[in-house]
Structure formats: C-alpha cells, structure tokens
Regions:
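Small-residue-rich segments of transmembrane alpha-helices in multi-pass membrane proteins
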Residues: 22-26, 80, 143-147
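Hydrophobic alpha-helical transmembrane segments of polytopic
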Residues: 24-28, 67, 164-167, 171
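Alpha-helical transmembrane segments and, especially, the helix-loop junctions at the ends
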Residues: 32-49, 63-103, 107, 112-126
Length: 178
C-alpha cells in the first residue's frame, strides 16, 4: 500500500466498473473479491465503496444491492486468499488429513467465487433495485441531499505502484508454488 500498489489496483477496478455499469451487481463483488484475494485482507473493499455507490446510482440501481454483495464477497474471499492468515491456518489443519495446499486453494477459490456470483444473481433477479421507485431516495433527491456524480478519479500514482503490484504477485505465485 505504501508503494501505491493498492491505488493502482483500485484505479483498474474503477475502470472495470465504469466501463460495464449495467453489470454492477456482478462486477462490484467480483472486483472486491479479487482485490481481497490479492491483498489477503477485506479492507481493500473500503476503497471501492464510493465508486460502487456512484455507478449504481448512475444506473438507477439502489446502491445497497451491489454494496452489500461486494462487502460480503470481499469477506468471503479471505477464506480463499493464498496470502490470508485464515487460509494458512486452515491449510495447516487440513494438510495432515491429506489435503494439499494447491488443492485447497483451488477448491476454495471456485466455491467461494461461485457462491458470491450466485448471491449476486439471486439479488438481481428477486430484489426491487429500481432507485427511481425508492421513496426515501426520491425525497432526499428533492431536498438536494444527494451529491452529484464526480466521475472517474484519476489519482496520481506513485512511481513504483505498478512494479510493487508485480513484485507482490510474483511473491504470491511463489507462495502458491512452494
């Protein structure tokens, strides 16, 4: 984070969300899931909250839907991140029972991501997500309490941001292969 790698990843994630806004209910949890997988902590999801809210509002979708799915997705991803303490601990418990680290990572990645996407599908199909029909939002909008969209935030990246992400990913790969 100090080298600017997280800012770089958030910038990429924001571009993904803004380039496909109508799929916010699926992309928001996907983005937070993979940020957590890469970082090993769910705190990375906090940096995505303002972007998710803006994109959802721009698509006339209640922000609570993609936000809640995204936050849950980031927390579930901790159980599949090769660099999280939870995975290291569970691997230590399960390896004596015959489960290898690569097998567990593969299993946890597939099942946790599938669960997140299934949840996003259920919310998208069965929840009332139309923001224009939300009386509380419409009242706040009429009172001028809703902030206008600020658009893409191109934050100046630190010089070593991209390199720090590359080095970190190589480290994660080495951990996986070890």
């Amino acid at each position: 984070q100090l080298a600017g790698g997280l800012d770089y990843l958030v910038q990429i994630a924001e571009r993904i969300l803004r380039s496909n806004p109508k799929y916010i209910n699926f992309l928001a949890p996907t983005v937070t899931y993979f940020l957590t997988i890469l970082a090993g902590t769910g705190h990375t999801a906090f940096s995505m909250i303002p972007v998710i809210v803006e994109v959802a509002k721009e698509q006339n979708i209640k922000p609570s839907a993609p936000l809640s799915i995204a936050v849950v997705s980031s927390q579930i991803a901790i159980t599949a991140s090769p660099v999280s303490a939870a995975v290291v601990y569970m691997t230590g418990v399960l390896e004596p029972l015959g489960w290898s680290y690569p097998t567990l990572i593969g299993l946890w990645l597939v099942t946790t991501f599938a669960g997140c996407m299934l949840t996003a599908l259920i919310i998208t199909l069965f929840a009332n997500l139309d923001l224009s029909k939300d009386p509380v939002y419409q009242e706040r909008l009429a009172q001028g309490l809703v902030k206008p969209s600020t658009g893409v935030q191109n934050k100046e990246l630190k010089p070593g941001a991209k390199l720090s992400v590359a080095i970190f990913l190589i480290g994660v790969l080495l951990v996986l292969l070890y």
